[in-house]
Curated annotation (Swiss-Prot):
Listed Gene3D superfamilies: Glycosidases
UniProt organism field: Sinapis alba (White mustard)
Catalytic activity: a thioglucoside + H2O = a sugar + a thiol
Residues that hold substrate according to the record: Y51, W173, E180, F181
GO molecular function, one term: beta-glucosidase activity
Organ and tissue specificity: In vacuoles called myrosin grains of a certain class of cells, myrosin cells, distributed in the cotyledons and the axis of the embryo as well as in different organs of the growing plant.
UniProt protein name: Myrosinase MB2
Length: 243
């Protein structure tokens, strides 16, 4: 509620979540009747970003309430590993806490449908970074990114069919590299490859070619689950071994 509820409750009900009002108290401003009427139902669609799932555990607040941040008030500590040192899902690069949990996108979409009345949703970002230490061959083969997008699209397709979630679009993050918060250019992104030492060396990665086939297949054939499942086969592992 201190994350999505902070803005979703006002957008749908014209007020902050009950638990926020209880914990934050007078430090949380109230909506006037006019403000509540103005903001409730004022959105056209929701743009949701999903990358990964984290564990949460209670976190005491040692500071006076007037010095609390939103995270302090939430009273939780988000972690990559549980008490047994386990990640929620498969690990790509443990030194960078790089893992994925594709079923999480199913739960998130179902949660938004159930709690907020099945709003119109676009997945505005979904993707993963890969280690900057990979070789050129590994970057172009890009089997990790294929597995990531494929597995998430499988669960996204599943929740649309099973739960009737109103998702109308999906944007793979990202087309090329970007400067990542806290990591700079030490990790790589993108469906396309660019050699920073030779900008004429540019190639569409295997992940980009795969995404092209997926998009084209989706437009021509509404039944795409078989394509998604077949993409999670040993073919990607063969590409990895070839490098």
């Amino acid at each position: 509620e201190f994350f999505h509820g902070w803005y979703m409750e006002p957008l749908t009900k014209g007020r902050y979540p009950d638990i926020m009002r209880q914990i934050v108290g007078t430090r949380l401003p109230n909506f006037t009747e006019d403000e509540a009427e103005l903001v409730a139902g004022s959105y056209d669609f929701l743009g949701l970003n999903y990358y990964v799932t984290q564990y949460a555990k209670p976190k005491p607040n040692p500071y006076p309430s007037e010095k609390h941040t939103a995270m302090d008030d939430a009273g939780v500590d988000l972690t990559f590993k549980n008490s047994r040192g386990e990640y929620p899902g498969p690990v790509f690069a443990e030194d960078a806490n790089s893992y994925y949990y594709p079923k999480g996108i199913y739960y998130v979409m179902d949660y938004f449908k159930t709690k907020y009345g099945n709003p119109l949703i676009y997945i505005t970002e979904n993707g993963i970074s890969t280690p900057g230490s990979e070789s050129r061959c590994e970057r172009i083969a890009d089997y990790k990114r294929i597995n990531y997008h494929c597995s998430h699209l499988c669960f996204l397709s599943k929740v649309i069919k099973e739960k009737g979630v109103n998702v109308r679009g999906y944007f793979a993050w990202a087309l090329g590299d970007n400067y990542e918060f806290g990591k700079g250019f030490t990790v790589r992104f993108g469906l396309s490859y660019v050699n920073w030492d030779d900008l004429n060396d540019r190639n569409l990665k295997e992940s980009g070619k795969w995404y092209q086939r997926f998009i084209n297949g989706t437009a021509k054939n509404p039944v795409k689950q078989n394509f998604l499942r077949s993409s999670l086969s040993s073919q990607n592992q063969k590409k990895r071994l070839a490098c």
